[in-house]
Every structure is written in C-alpha cells, then in structure tokens.
Amino acid sequence: MALLELVDFHYYYGNIHSVKGVNMYVDQGEMVTLIGSNGAGKTTTMQSISGLTKRRGIRGKIIFEGKEIQNYMGYKVANLGIAQSLEGRRIFSKLSVEENLKMGAYLRKDNIKADMDRVYERFPRLLERRTQMGGTLSGGEQQMLAMGRALMQRPKLLLLDEPSLGLAPLIVKEIFKAVNEINQEGTTVLFVEQNSKIALGTAHRGYVMQTGEIVMSDSCANLLTNEDVKKAYLGG
C-alpha cells in the first residue's frame, strides 16, 4: 500500500480548473519529484496534500496511510505526520533561528532538544546563527531553516516546494545533499522542483505535470533519457 496516493484529484479555484484528474502515489521510503513549468499546478497539488488550500476546491481523493484526508485542514494533516517546507521559505523573519525551529515542534513537547540538535548537526550554519533573526539570514540559510523547521515535526512524509528557488549552485548542491540524506535515513520525500535536471538526478521516480495534468511518469533514470523530457525541461 502506498504511503500517499492521489486518485482522480482535481482542484478548482472558483471556475478555474487548475489541476485535472491527477493520479499519483508515493511509497514508504521513496523520494519522488513532481516537475513542470511555472503554473502547471504543482504547488496547488502540494498545498492540497498538506491542507493549505480551500477544501471546497477539491474533487477526488487524497489518501495517506490508507485514510482519505482531502477534507482535512492543515493542522489535522500535520498531526498525521505530513510536513511541508513551502515555496519561498516562509520562515518567521522576526523570530530567531531557534524560535523558528521550536515552532516546527509546536504539536508536541517531547525530545525537542534532541531533534533540534539533529537539525543543527545536519545544518551547522544554523547552529552558528541560532540567536540570529530569521529575516537576516541568507537565502540558502533560510532554506535550511525552513527544512529544519519541517523536520522538527518528525514527519513521515516531507513535502518540499521549490527548495532550490533563487539559490546559488553551490548552495543548491548542499541543499539536495541534505534532502538525499534525509531520505536515506528513512523519511519519505515528495518535492516540486523547476530545476528538472537536479530533480531527476536526485529522486527515484518522477511525474511530469503540464497545464494541471500528469502527462508522464517513470523512473528518474528513464525520464532523464526521454527525448520529450530532454527537449522540454533539460535544455536538450
């Protein structure tokens, strides 16, 4: 049984049909990517999974651990073990690094320090800046903080929306090294990424989204050599 499954999933913004009949799944322990151009419906799909879109816009099913969650609000989805690092980071700019991380653990009180230590071990720069306000961090440090805050939730499923957005190539490499390690340590990962080459070079499987529809899915190894994918997304 898949950890996460979308079955004939649609999303409507009023009369605008933005996501159209998506069927996709993520198995326990997998790392899966959703690629596509801007406006394809990727972020709407991710935010619908995590309970951040208006529920009345949803048609179809979102299933997590065998339970339908398409009507769940965000706090209830988070309680199930789904955490999202949002596009554009969305950290608390007026809170310190440490306070931001504590916000990620607001649903519980146990072993917060141990989890924070693990985040600092993964992202040593956050330890160096733990008393610094989030808004004063560099873009790469803010992305590390956003991911660290999501990890403080101890998620079963980690959702990442455009983790490389606006970052220098060296920082992108560092971020995706961390994503790979997080997955290897047992956390299931689903991420949206416009840098298709990096996405397909990191994940196990990929889905290609165009104008709200999944038009292709395969192993990332196969997608990397697919001529249509190369022409549309890999500059080939």
Segments (PLM) and residue ranges:
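Glycine-rich phosphate-binding loops of nucleotide-dependent enzymes
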Residues: 2-236
